[in-house]
From Swiss-Prot:
GO terms for molecular function: rRNA binding; structural constituent of ribosome; tRNA binding. NCBIfam families: PRK00010.1 (NF000585). Signal peptide: none annotated. The lineage of its organism: Bacteria, Pseudomonadati, Pseudomonadota, Alphaproteobacteria, Rhodobacterales. Keywords: Ribonucleoprotein, Ribosomal protein, RNA-binding, rRNA-binding, tRNA-binding. It comes from Ruegeria pomeroyi (strain ATCC 700808 / DSM 15171 / DSS-3). This is Large ribosomal subunit protein uL5.
Length: 186
């Protein structure tokens, strides 16, 4: 039986035991504080036109995202009105959640080992970094996560996943994520 007081997520332990040393050797860091680490993971579901037609869609997306993340997601709202799209200011448009600490490592583990292999025609993720060491990716169907019961889903949503790191360059961030077994296709 797991002892909750002594529990450490698998990827967090792997980072402390092997990944830090490998990155220090690979990039020649002189100080341990220079070694890149994961800062946060932001998950976002945008409902778009569906939320305009039915306000319950954003609530449904929020509930699904809360199940996936393991913590309560917040509803995102429209910043301004756009008459052409029938969008009003403060209208619910989706949901987002920011993961840090142990939940972040647990989510990354589930994403890489469980959800990604379940994606249809999966050939790896495109290495899309922002130039400052942050990685962004999209998933077309949120139902690839085991927390979502396919029979109870009223709508299949796409999802944005942003992994923020303390890396200064894209090469450092890519190496960090590769050590976590992120399956890049190039």
């Amino acid at each position: 039986m797991l002892d909750a007081a002594n529990y450490t997520p698998r990827l967090k332990a792997q980072y402390a035991e092997t990944i830090r040393a490998a990155l220090k050797e690979e990039f020649g860091y002189k100080n341990d504080m220079m070694i890149p680490k994961l800062e946060k993971i932001v998950l976002n579901i945008g409902c778009g036109a569906e939320a305009v037609k039915d306000s319950k869609k954003a609530k449904s997306a929020q509930e699904d995202l809360s199940k996936i993340a393991g913590q309560k997601a917040i509803t995102t709202t429209a910043k301004k009105s756009i008459a052409g799209f029938r969008v009003r200011e403060d209208m619910p448009m989706g949901a987002k959640v920011t993961l840090r600490g142990e939940r972040m490592y647990e989510f990354l583990d589930r994403l890489i080992t469980i959800a990604m292999p379940r994606i249809r025609d999966f050939r790896g993720v495109k290495p899309s970094f922002d130039g400052r060491g942050n990685f962004a990716m999209g998933i077309k169907e949120h139902i690839v996560f085991p927390e979502i019961d396919f029979d109870k889903v009223d709508e299949v949503w796409g999802m944005d996943i942003v992994i923020a790191t303390t890396a200064k360059t894209d090469a450092e961030a890519k190496s960090l994520l590769k050590h976590f077994n992120m399956p890049f296709n190039a």
